[in-house]
């Protein structure tokens, strides 16, 4: 069993080429058409696991941490932390739900540890599904609802007509169980 966290394009390539059985991605209005075409071209299927409204991940000590809901205007003074997408530096492949945001301060990172360290050290933020596990990530990063009227569909991709291994099935079951209680 290998768990890799990588760029969106690599996830699609890895599943298409058989390096990975599964990939976890999200679809929303700005990337769905492009990614769906890629799935079809690579003989992949997308299976929705859950829907989520956008949230921000911030430090528990962030100046906005006591807000129940955070607006884009309130976030403008703080660094927007986004994952680098390498050669496919297109917002269609962005890891962040709202990569289309035009924020005055942007920092690209390659991994979650760096992103969380900068969120804590610089009062930065990133936009995501809101799903965060305190057992895995600690209690320094919290999730707050972002005041936006849109939805993301989080799901998995796999090769069409593939028989999944017991590890893949167990992983899917764990994800579904965890996201059902979040």
Regions found by a protein language model. Name each.
Residues 32-33, 64-65, 72, 76-100, ...:
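Secondary-structure junction motif
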Residues 8, 90-92, 111-113:
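Conserved glycosyltransferase catalytic-site signature
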Residues 1-3, 97-107, 140-141:
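A local structural motif
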Residues 1-33, 109:
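Central regulatory/effector-binding core of bacterial HTH transcription factors
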Residues 38-80:
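Flexible hinge/capping segments at coil-to-helix
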Residues 40-47, 52-53, 113-162:
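Beta-alpha-beta core module
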């Amino acid at each position: 069993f290998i768990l890799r966290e990588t760029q969106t394009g690599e996830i699609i390539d890895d599943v298409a080429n058989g390096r990975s059985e599964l990939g976890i991605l999200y679809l929303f209005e700005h990337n769905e058409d492009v990614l769906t075409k890629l799935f079809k071209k690579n003989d992949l299927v997308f299976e929705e696991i859950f829907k989520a409204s956008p949230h921000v991940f911030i430090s528990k000590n962030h100046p906005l941490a006591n807000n129940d809901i955070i607006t884009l205007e309130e976030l403008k003074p703080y660094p927007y932390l986004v994952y680098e997408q390498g050669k496919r530096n297109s917002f269609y492949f962005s890891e962040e739900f709202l990569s289309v945001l035009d924020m005055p301060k942007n920092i690209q990172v390659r991994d979650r540890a760096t992103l969380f360290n900068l969120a804590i050290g610089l009062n930065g933020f990133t936009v995501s599904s809101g799903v965060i596990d305190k057992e895995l990530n600690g209690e320094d990063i919290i999730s707050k609802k972002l005041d936006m009227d849109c939805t993301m569909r989080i799901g998995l991709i796999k090769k069409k007509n593939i028989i999944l291994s017991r590890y893949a099935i167990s992983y899917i079951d764990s994800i579904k169980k965890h996201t059902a209680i979040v």
